[in-house]
Amino acid sequence: MKQFKVVPTIQEFETCKDFADTYGIGKGDLVFVSNGTKNHLFPELDNSGAIVVNYRNYGSGEPTDLIVEGICKDLEGKTYNRVFSIGGGTILDVAKLFALKTVSPVVKLFNKELEIVKDKELILVPTTCGTGSEVTNISILELTAINSKFGLAVDELYPDKAILIPELLAGLPMKYFATSSIDALIHSIESFTSPKGNDFTRMFSLNAMDMILKGYQEIAKNGEEARKPILRQFMLASTYAGIAFGNAGCAAVHAMSYPLGAKYHVPHGEANYAIFTEVYKTYMKLQPVGIINKLNNHLAGILGCGEDEVYTEIEKLLNHIIPKKALHEYGMTQEDIADFTETVMTKQTRLMNNNYTELTAETVTEIYKSLF
């Protein structure tokens, strides 16, 4: 059986003020937002009566179980009915957990050893153009005990509202624009080739690919500032890709990037890009006939090349956005290859089940070696 659903109501606002006026955030609300975003765009939060959490007070980089436990401790005894999160994917993923009745112990929650009950309204507002988290039922944390990222995917994590405000992308530095939008591109591609994909998910995948790659071509031709007039295009593409992978899932690219990102603190989109094309070249060697042919045909049309050249040409285009690095440039060692492979094969089965074709441990090892 194939299925497709979009749970959150998606709303778009012209400005942050329009959003704030509509929702009237105040007493009884929990708001996750960085100091920079709050001070610049939502200064009224300081005197609103809402509980305001600056995620960065609890740690830097990608979210961990320890960060969530720290926030839980500080929220003990405080009550709230609505959870707002205004930020990138890390902040959105953390905030989702606080719409649940019980969050701690976090490791038990992620292992599904706790009863999972949602008892608060959840409103997510992305400030980047990559996560897609605003429309998915997935929260990703680094679990420090296994030194890798791990996902919890349950319907209780679906937001009630996904709020799109293109104004929020205006101040996003090129570096963060690059890593987040590449993540969205890979969401669209992995969901397209997933066995769980269907005509509905692939419609969203293809639209996201078109919008992102054509935007990249504009940037490659005219420079970084060319992104400014098309920021709404990238925000929509990110949400389209989120709808696609929220239904069809991501796969080996994400699974293989997680240990790299967790151990060496590589930004999520950049870690995905480091792995991406080699996985798809491997798919083509193992199973050259299938849905991947439709993907290659579509990409060839956008890139203006032959189907046998798409992964070379897409890499050339992406290198205008963020240069690709070898894995050792992030600090990865030869010894990590075996450890990362074991983590992928034993801890990331949720993702590996969505591969276009089966990848064995030996194949995963070879991909890491070729990228080292």
Identify what each model region corresponds to.
Residues 41-43, 94-96, 134-135, 173:
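Short glycine-/acidic-enriched loop or helix-start segments at secondary-structure transitions
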Residues 156, 298-372:
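C-terminal charged capping/lid subdomain of soluble metabolic enzymes
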Residues 1-82, 327:
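ATP/NTP phosphate-donor binding region
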Residues 103-199, 290-294:
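A glycine/threonine-rich phosphate-anchoring loop and its flanking beta-alpha core
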Residues 93-104:
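DPxDG-like acidic metal-binding loop motif
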Residues 29-31, 81-84, 121-123, 160-162, ...:
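Structural motif
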